[in-house]
Each structure stands twice: as structure tokens, then as C-alpha cells.
Curated annotation (Swiss-Prot):
Its EC number is 2.3.1.117. Keywords: Acyltransferase, Amino-acid biosynthesis, Cytoplasm, Diaminopimelate biosynthesis, Lysine biosynthesis, Repeat, Transferase. It comes from the Bacteria. Pathway: Amino-acid biosynthesis; L-lysine biosynthesis via DAP pathway; LL-2,6-diaminopimelate from (S)-tetrahydrodipicolinate (succinylase route): step 1/3. This is 2,3,4,5-tetrahydropyridine-2,6-dicarboxylate N-succinyltransferase. It is an enzyme of class 2 (transferase). The keyword Amino-acid biosynthesis applies. It is found in: Cytoplasm.
């Protein structure tokens, strides 16, 4: 693995000169190997170790390099045709491959090669980009999008029209992460490497990026970039210092432990706030 990483790191420094016509065979083989390992779940862009998320920047660099060395090519679909650098994950899947994968794919859901889909995942007509990791038991509902390299935990529900941001550029940015057992309400957007802690509920139409103020109603604290575990979050606003206007924020209206989260329905958590 160290040799693979060093090959990618060295090649990335001279990426500007690369084209599909001058790429070395060894480098192309290395990039393909990384994408295959991402596709199978043997590698992932970010992992949680000792309670902290670590991003493997070299894997993201391999994904970026793949765009430099691949030409657009014809992609045949069931009801249309396409022209892109990245093939469909399921282009060569047989019925047996789908059964072995243990997930459901409802047409016209699209998953790019290099994304991992775990068992018991349900993909409604949605989009999952290259480098993403979607863990067991997750529902990706209609018109939801999972951006490049985003990390989606176990038993997550991404409701209709949800957008989970991708972060291949800039390459030093961390991926957007939705931890286990989270519910993301319809048409919400979580982007720019924000982390949503496990067992959290994000209400409908909440937008969270790195510059979004996250206001804890119980403590009065304002934070950025991370939703604590067990949070129930809704859209809100905070007044300006002079009181002349208000600006958007996300409001943590309550926090619950995992036991309460398991026993309480989603709608009930969002009532009485």
C-alpha cells in the first residue's frame, strides 16, 4: 500500500502535464487499482479511528488523476446514452452480482464506478458520485445526491432531494460525513466537509456548510462545521449586533441519547420545539 501511495503522490505533482495519450502504463494501473479498491470497499477516503475522522488525501488524489488520464467514452444506458470519463458502477453487473451485493437499485438511480454500496442499501432514483461510501442499511431516497468521496454511515436515511456535498476540489478539504443512524430531512444540504454526528436528526430544508452558524438553543453556544451526536437540528436565524436584520443559521433545538433516539419516532422528535 505504501508503494501505491507514493506512486500516486509523485504523479499528482506533475498532473498538469498528463493526458490520456501520455500516461505511463504503471501509473494507469495504479490509479485503476485504487478505484477498484474504492469500488469494493477495501479502501475508503476517510475512516474513523479512535473517535476521530482521518482523511486519506492520497486516495482523493488518485480519483482526481483518473480524470486527467481518461478520455470521455460512450456509455450505454437502458433508455439513453451518455458520454463521460467515469463508467457506471453497474455497467457490467449481472443478476448474480446484484444479489451478491445485497442492495436494491431503483431505476434510474446512477452510481459511478469507484463508489461503494454496502448490503441492505436502497437506492431510489438518486445519484452517488465516485469515491463515496454508503454503509449498510442506508436509504438514499428519490433525487438525493451523494457527492464525491462523501461518507455515509449505517442506517442513515437521506430523504428526497437531499444534497450531500462532494469535495474533490480543493484536494486538502475533508469529505462531508454523515455518521450512523442519522436522518437528513427532505431538501436539506450538508456540504464542505461538515460532519453530522451519529443519531442526529436534521429537519427538512436545513442548509449547513463550513460558514453556517450552528446555534445550540440550550447553551447559547455558536459553532461551525460539526453537528454533535444526538442533535435535533432545524432552520433558524440569529439577529445582527445592531438588531436591524437576521441571518440564517442552523439551530440545535435538543439533544437526545442513543437509547431515546432508538425509541422515538422521527416526527415525534421534531415536535414541541
Amino acid at each position: 500500500m505504501d508503494q501505491l501511495q507514493s506512486t500516486i503522490e509523485e504523479a499528482f505533482e506533475r498532473r498538469a502535464e498528463m493526458t490520456p495519450r501520455n500516461v505511463e502504463a504503471k501509473l494507469k494501473e495504479s490509479i485503476t487499482q485504487v478505484l477498484e479498491m474504492l469500488d469494493s470497499g477495501k479502501l475508503r477516503v476517510a475512516e474513523k479511528t479512535d473517535g476521530e475522522w482521518k482523511t486519506h488525501q492520497w486516495i482523493k488524489k488518485a480519483v482526481l488523476l483518473s480524470f486527467r488520464i481518461e478520455d470521455n467514452s460512450f456509455i450505454k444506458g437502458g433508455f439513453s446514452n451518455y458520454f463521460d470519463k467515469v463508467p457506471s458502477k453497474f455497467a457490467d453487473y449481472s443478476s448474480r452480482d446484484f444479489r451478491n451485493g445485497g442492495f436494491r437499485v431503483v431505476p434510474p438511480a446512477t452510481v459511478r464506478k469507484g463508489a461503494f454500496i454496502a448490503s441492505n442499501v436502497v437506492l431510489m432514483p438518486s445519484y452517488v458520485n465516485i469515491g463515496a461510501y454508503v454503509d449498510e442499511g442506508t436509504m438514499v431516497d428519490t433525487w438525493a445526491t451523494v457527492g464525491s468521496c462523501a461518507q455515509i454511515g449505517k442506517n442513515v436515511h437521506l430523504s428526497g432531494g437531499v444534497g450531500i456535498g462532494g469535495v474533490l476540489e480543493p484536494v486538502q478539504a475533508n469529505p462531508t460525513i454523515i455518521e450512523d443512524n442519522c436522518f437528513i430531512g427532505a431538501r436539506s444540504e450538508v456540504v464542505e466537509g461538515v460532519i453530522v454526528g451519529e443519531n442526529s436528526v436534521i429537519s427538512m430544508g436545513v442548509y449547513i456548510g463550513q460558514s453556517t452558524r450552528i446555534y445550540n438553543r440550550e447553551t447559547g453556544e455558536i459553532s461551525y462545521g460539526r453537528i454533535p451526536p444526538g442533535s435535533v437540528v432545524v432552520s433558524g436565524s440569529l439577529p445582527s449586533a445592531d438588531g436591524k436584520y437576521s441571518l440564517y443559521c442552523a439551530v440545535i433545538v435538543k439533544q437526545v441519547d442513543a437509547k431515546t433516539r432508538a425509541k422515538t419516532g422521527i416526527n415525534e422528535l421534531l415536535r414541541g420545539i
